[in-house]
């Protein structure tokens, strides 16, 4: 029975029908899976030599870097892999916003759950080196979460970031990637259940098998991203690292500016430009909820016809503003909290939510035309 199941899965993967006109934008999911696997592999090796205790955490990282054979390589590959995971995730979501992936709500929602787990896992992992920036970043974020009763005390093991905090963060950082891996398999199952989308946004009978045609496209993309991954891990990770995080924690000295990793900057800009910490936290949660709400603009009984592409002008304009506002918040997040950047941040927060809600409401109101879909079916039958 097991042998039959393996053969059935193998035949499905080899003969999986894919649209003829998909391009390199459909390569990001495969690349995400490869980089995520490298993250888990390097993370397991690093966890075997890491000591989750505030007196030894920083020195265990230095031991891995300086004394362990190839330890620096594993540590830098793990740090670079985190950036690549979020870069590919943002590109993957961007492709989904442009090319009708929202019309597969199960795949879209499961993918966003994976994205949320990535955010939590990356933040927890950022605290583990126990550098100056790690400690103060954890202090700021946990203070923001203090508006939720009992959560901070349960998460930190007390009222401040201390030894129980780093122990709990280490355990969560080790477990959450495997939880995300389980949801990745569910995400792939839903994708294969409905089939892949294509740039035109409508179902087509012109399909080709995954092997060897599209597998060669995935291998080509993997070669390109792996070269970038190695170059960044070996040569580019030190210049991009924040120097304050290479300093042992000093609880009496605050850094000039608390700067998280670049993939947190849009959410950090929302927190930084809103004076109330509770309101800032609600806005961050609302920004994630807005992505979930976009999955509501679909109808499983209709055929997708050139929807959610840049050709649909009444849809593309607010969606372009939605994406541009997100990347503007990314830039504002790395700036000093001056009045001009706070003003720009609030304006782009308004633009982010208004354009996203306008795209949701306007597109849902104007594109549920069941009669036109019926006419398309009749025309095809003729």
From Swiss-Prot:
GO terms of biological process kind: mitochondrial electron transport, ubiquinol to cytochrome c
Co-factor note (free text): Binds 2 heme b groups non-covalently.
Membrane-spanning ranges: 28-48, 72-94, 107-127, 169-189, 214-234, 274-294, 317-337, 340-360
Cofactors that this protein relies on: heme b
Positions that bind heme b b566: 92, 187
GO cellular component labels: mitochondrial inner membrane
UniProt-annotated binding residues for a ubiquinone: 192
Subcellular location: Mitochondrion inner membrane
InterPro entries found in the cross-reference section: Cyt_b/b6_C, Cyt_b/b6_C_sf, Cyt_b/b6_N, Cytb/b6-like_sf, Cytochrome_b_N_euk/bac, Di-haem_cyt_TM
Record family assignment: Belongs to the cytochrome b family.
Any further remark recorded for this protein: Heme 1 (or BL or b562) is low-potential and absorbs at about 562 nm, and heme 2 (or BH or b566) is high-potential and absorbs at about 566 nm.
PANTHER family assigned to the protein according to its UniProt record, in alphabetical order: CYTOCHROME B (PTHR19271:SF16)
Entry protein name: Cytochrome b
Naturally occurring in which organism (per UniProt): Plasmodium vivax (strain Salvador I)
Lineage: Eukaryota, Sar, Alveolata, Apicomplexa, Aconoidasida
Gene: MT-CYB
């Amino acid at each position: 029975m097991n042998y039959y199941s393996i053969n059935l899965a193998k035949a499905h993967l080899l003969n999986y029908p894919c649209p003829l006109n998909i391009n390199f934008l459909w390569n990001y999911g495969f690349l995400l899976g490869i980089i995520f696997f490298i993250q888990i592999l390097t993370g397991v090796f690093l966890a075997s030599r890491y000591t989750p205790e505030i007196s030894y955490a920083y020195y265990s990282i230095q031991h891995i870097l300086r004394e362990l054979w190839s330890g620096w390589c594993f540590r830098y590959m793990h740090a670079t892999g985190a950036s690549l995971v979020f870069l590919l995730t943002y590109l993957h979501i961007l492709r989904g916003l442009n090319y009708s992936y929202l019309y597969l709500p199960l795949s879209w929602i499961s993918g966003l759950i994976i994205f949320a787990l990535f955010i939590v896992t990356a933040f927890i992992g950022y605290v583990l080196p126990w550098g100056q920036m790690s400690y103060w970043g954890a202090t700021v974020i946990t203070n923001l979460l203090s508006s939720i009763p009992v959560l901070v005390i349960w998460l930190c093991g007390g009222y401040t970031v201390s030894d129980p905090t780093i122990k709990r963060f280490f355990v969560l950082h080790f477990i959450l990637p495997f939880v995300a891996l389980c949801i990745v398999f569910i995400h792939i199952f839903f994708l294969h259940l409905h089939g892949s989308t294509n740039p035109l946004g409508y179902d087509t009978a012109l399909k080709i098998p995954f092997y060897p045609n599209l597998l060669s496209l995935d291998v080509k993309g993997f070669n390109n991203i792996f070269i970038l991954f190695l170059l960044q891990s070996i040569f580019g990770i030190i210049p991009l690292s924040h120097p304050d995080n290479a300093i042992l924690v000093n609880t009496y000295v605050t850094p000039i500016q608390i700067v998280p990793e670049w993939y947190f900057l849009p959410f950090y800009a929302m927190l930084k430009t809103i004076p109330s910490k509770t309101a800032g936290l609600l806005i961050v949660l609302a920004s994630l909820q807005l992505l979930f709400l976009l999955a509501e603009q679909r109808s499983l009984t209709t055929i997708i016809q050139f929807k959610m592409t840049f050709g649909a002008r009444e849809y593309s304009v607010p969606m372009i503003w939605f994406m541009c506002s997100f990347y503007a918040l990314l830039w504002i997040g790395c700036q000093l909290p001056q009045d001009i950047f706070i003003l720009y941040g609030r304006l782009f927060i308004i633009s982010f939510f208004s354009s996203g809600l306008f795209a949701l409401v306007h597109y849902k109101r104007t594109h549920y035309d069941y009669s036109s879909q019926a006419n398309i079916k009749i025309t095809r039958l003729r």
